């Protein structure tokens, strides 16, 4: 047994403090010099010391022996051989006789899955030998070669064929002393007990095993990195193999041939060199880790081997590895000047010496180094969201993904999930558990729940992707909890981005093309929509965005892609995200006397891309105000005790993750119901009932399908029923807020008023109680706006029908008669018909004044005023009757 195991936990002895037996002085390895022949140490007769040939004195080179490192290697090798996990994934204990060692199983799996990395749980290492664990953490960079040597020895022992296959035949036949590359196999440690932020990294962490967390903002392409180089001397063609590359291109210092003095002329033999995958990612501090008033800091992380392409832009990841100092390429030299070291030959002691100028001459060192992180392990940062690391999941694998998710849960979690699925009224209970700090707004909570569930992504035979994600916009008065919903969703989902519309540009939302400071190449830096891929992008103050910036997200909202053609880069990037937007009405408060389109600063294409619009009004209601005030006061007084939802956040995350594995489909009844509801929406829109929201298009039909699928997922069923379609229809109708209009005053024209005045005069027989002013006043009638629009639409429909038949004008009598026939089902008594005729006459007069219709004058005698029934009316040539009938708006 190694000295490490015999020392146990006695870490108080120096070197030495890890409990290792060592012959070092201090903590430095000893240098053992082998005995030399006396003749080899003698000087030549001429007194000059000649250079010894490298090959001839191979045994005479001083050899450094790190006894502490050897002890670590032996102890780590014993750990890999001896450690056995007491419990398997299912939680059942296995007999020790039938259980194979934990890491020996991993070594056997290397050849099976053709991987090169063994993953070591730091908790296992601590429980087995805490002294060894402490030594590896504090001096990982020093002990890393010894740990890899121990791993290679075990791979050679248990999987000799796979170990030999890692060597190229050329290298194996090149030299009998050729050994396996240290870069071929790798170790990855995880589950370290402590995590650091980017801001905590200092130079004292260099070389120590550390876990850092951050959000990935940029990833480079995977490139080959030279791990072990084989060089050929250009002068004598001697081959030098196994030249380790230490963070830069490293050539041999001198040719080993005793007859060759070459030190610079080398040619790399690519076929006999070993390469490994290399990738650089840039991470940024998480938003909750940035101190007040500070800018977020970034750090470059180097990934090698099997862990490349594990971190995507927008992922919150935990990286385990070591902090290293590398040259800062961007600071090494001035453009056009080759950076090189030279000696200042000026004679400052002479008579012609100039004064000392500049900080460099005063001894200030150049800052030409920066910190980077060399990672050996990449994991999702699920420290705060234990069950919500991938809440949304794409649901593309169906049953297989469902089984895989259930296998990742414990038995207790599975029982709890089963109870939730089989409970009654789960849809409404899930809604009430969302955003418990926000009082009321059940309709908005339903929409957010369905957005988290999402619809089913589809692919047409032509290869066109049909999105399943839902886009929601919340419009309302100030202080109606719009931003609270956005914050809640960002905290609920691990892959959610919060941004503000006023502070966001088009490039910041989509993607930007930036120039890499090291290579000089143009690369794509992800924007908010790319970072929220497979998540939700919450955009607050959406109405404050410039219209040019709103146009930039048209493609992302519908096609869920971002196309870029800049700086020689043509790319189409994925932005499979849902957008949750919040907007304030124009003027601060929602005006119920105008349409939704006129209340918000959005273009029609943007509005049609939102599946749901929720309008929140701050109305005075004594009961609602009392309950709302009590809820807010309880939160300030009792904190978390005031919010007691039925389901916790972890339960909601598990349920949503499980529900997204379902792929519900439409049946015959639900298809017929969707067609029926869509026809009803279009009919209401054509008749003016939907004028207060936006035009109903085919996108609203697709929205109804996506909402129905999301409701089916919320109920964990595979079939969409007509009841789900009706619920989706009712949600879609929520955005159609009734527009309050002032009553319309209609009156008779001057001739009709004069006739009525004469009749009144003859009737009163000179009654002195009626003043002359009242007699001259024209009679006015107030009708509701909806009634006015209904009569106007009926009149215009009759005129347009006659116009298509070739009739230029319609007499008023025929026009009124045709209108009454069109609406005959609305009249029950003769008094209703007489009253309606009077209203139609007054509306005709107003339509003439508003230049919607015009009266055709009598060509024979224009001075003679015809009776009302004989007057001829036609559509005014300046009136756009199609637009007027589509939205129902009339000039004021």
Curated annotation (Swiss-Prot):
Catalytic activity as recorded in UniProt: ATP + H2O = ADP + phosphate + H(+)
Ranges in coiled-coil conformation: none
Matching SMART domains: MCM (SM00350)
EC code(s) of this entry: 3.6.4.12
Record bears the keyword ATP-binding: yes
Top-level taxon in the UniProt lineage: Eukaryota
Record-given protein name: DNA replication licensing factor mcm6
Recorded name of the encoding gene: mcm6
């Amino acid at each position: 047994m190694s000295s490490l195991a015999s020392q146990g936990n006695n870490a108080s002895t120096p070197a030495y403090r890890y409990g290792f037996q060592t012959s070092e002085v201090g903590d430095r390895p000893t240098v053992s010099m082998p005995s030399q022949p006396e003749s080899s140490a003698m000087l030549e007769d001429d007194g000059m010391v000649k250079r010894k040939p490298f090959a001839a004195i191979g045994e005479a080179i001083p050899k450094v022996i790190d006894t502490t490192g050897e002890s670590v290697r032996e102890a780590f090798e014993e750990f890999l051989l001896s450690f056995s996990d007491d419990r398997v994934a299912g939680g059942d204990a296995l007999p020790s006789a039938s259980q194979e060692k934990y890491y020996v199983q991993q070594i056997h799996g290397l050849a099976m899955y053709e991987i090169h990395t063994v993953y070591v749980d730091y908790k296992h290492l601590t429980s087995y030998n805490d002294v060894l664990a402490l030594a590896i953490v504090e001096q990982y960079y020093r002990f890393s070669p010894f740990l890899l040597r121990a791993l290679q020895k075990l791979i050679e022992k248990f999987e000799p064929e796979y170990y030999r296959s890692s060597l190229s035949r050329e290298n194996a036949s090149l030299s009998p002393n050729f050994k396996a590359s240290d870069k071929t196999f790798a170790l990855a440690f995880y589950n370290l007990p402590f995590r650091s932020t980017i801001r905590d990294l200092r130079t004292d962490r260099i070389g120590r095993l550390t876990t850092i967390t951050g959000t990935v903002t940029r990833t480079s392409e995977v490139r080959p990195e030279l791990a072990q180089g084989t060089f050929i001397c250009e002068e004598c063609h001697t081959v030098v193999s196994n030249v380790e590359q230490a963070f830069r291109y490293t050539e041999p210092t001198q040719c080993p041939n005793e007859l060759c003095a070459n030190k610079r002329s080398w040619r790399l033999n690519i076929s006999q060199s070993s390469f490994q995958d290399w990738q650089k990612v840039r991470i940024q501090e998480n938003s909750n880790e940035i101190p007040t008033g500070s800018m977020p800091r970034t750090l470059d992380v180097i990934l090698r081997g099997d862990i490349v392409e594990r971190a995507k832009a927008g992922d919150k990841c935990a990286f385990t590895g070591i902090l290293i100092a590398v040259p800062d390429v961007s600071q090494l030299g001035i453009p056009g000047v080759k950076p090189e070291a030279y000696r200042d030959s000026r004679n400052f002691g002479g008579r012609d010496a100039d004064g000392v100028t500049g900080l460099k001459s005063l001894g200030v060192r150049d800052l030409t180094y920066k910190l980077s992180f060399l990672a050996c392990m990449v994991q999702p940062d699920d420290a705060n969201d234990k069950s919500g690391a991938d809440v949304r999941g794409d649901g593309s694998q169906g049953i297989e993904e469902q089984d895989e998710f259930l296998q990742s849960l414990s038995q207790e979690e599975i029982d709890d999930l089963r109870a939730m699925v089989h409970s009654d009224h789960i849809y409404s209970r899930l809604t009430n558990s969302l955003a418990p700090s926000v009082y009321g707004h059940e309709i908005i909570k339903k929409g957010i729940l369905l957005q988290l569930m999402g619809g089913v992504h589809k692919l047409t035979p032509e290869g066109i992707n049909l999105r399943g994600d839902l886009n929601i916009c919340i419009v309302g008065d100030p202080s109606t909890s719009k931003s609270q919903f956005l914050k809640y969703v960002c905290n609920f989902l691990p892959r959610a981005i919060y941004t503000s519309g006023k502070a966001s540009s088009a490039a910041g939302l989509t993607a930007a093309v930036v120039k890499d400071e090291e290579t000089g190449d143009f690369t794509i830096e992800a924007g908010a929509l790319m970072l929220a891929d497979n998540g939700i992008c919450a955009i607050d103050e959406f109405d404050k965005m410039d219209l040019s910036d709103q146009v930039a997200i048209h493609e992302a909202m519908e096609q869920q892609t971002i196309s870029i053609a800049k700086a020689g880069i043509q790319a189409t990037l994925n932005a499979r995200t849902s957008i949750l937007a919040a907007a304030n009405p124009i003027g601060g408060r929602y005006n119920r006397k105008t349409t939704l389109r006129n209340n918000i600063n959005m273009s029609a294409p943007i509005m049609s891309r939102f599946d749901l619009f929720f309008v929140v009004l701050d109305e005075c209601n004594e009961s609602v105000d009392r309950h709302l005030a009590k809820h807010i006061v309880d939160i300030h007084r009792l904190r978390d005790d005031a919010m007691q939802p039925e389901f916790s956040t972890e339960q909601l995350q598990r349920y949503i993750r499980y529900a997204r594995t379902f792929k519900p489909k439409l049946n015959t009844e639900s298809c017929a119901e969707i067609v029926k509801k869509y026809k009803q929406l279009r009919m209401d829109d054509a008749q003016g009932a939907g004028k207060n929201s936006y035009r109903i298009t085919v996108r609203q039909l697709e929205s109804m399908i996506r909402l129905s699928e999301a409701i089916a997922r919320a109920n964990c069923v595979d079939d969409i029923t007509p009841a789900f379609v009706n619920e989706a229809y009712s949600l879609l109708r929520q955005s159609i807020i009734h527009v309050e209009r002032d009553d319309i005053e209609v009156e008779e024209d001057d001739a009709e008023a004069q006739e009525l005045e004469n009749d009144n005069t003859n009737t009163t027989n000179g009654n002195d109680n009626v003043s002359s002013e009242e007699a001259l006043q024209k009679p006015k009638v107030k009708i509701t706006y909806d009634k006015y629009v209904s009569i106007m639409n009926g009149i215009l429909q009759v005129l347009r029908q006659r116009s298509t038949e070739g009739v230029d004008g319609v007499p008023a009598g025929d026009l009124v008669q045709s209108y009454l026939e069109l609406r005959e089902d609305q009249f029950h008594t003769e008094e209703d018909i007489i009253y309606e005729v009077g209203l139609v006459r007054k509306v005709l007069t107003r339509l003439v004044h508003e230049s919607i219709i015009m009266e055709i004058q009598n060509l024979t005698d224009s001075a003679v005023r015809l009776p009302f029934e004989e007057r001829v009316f036609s559509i005014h040539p300046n009136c756009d009757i199609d637009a007027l009938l589509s939205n129902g708006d009339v000039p004021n």
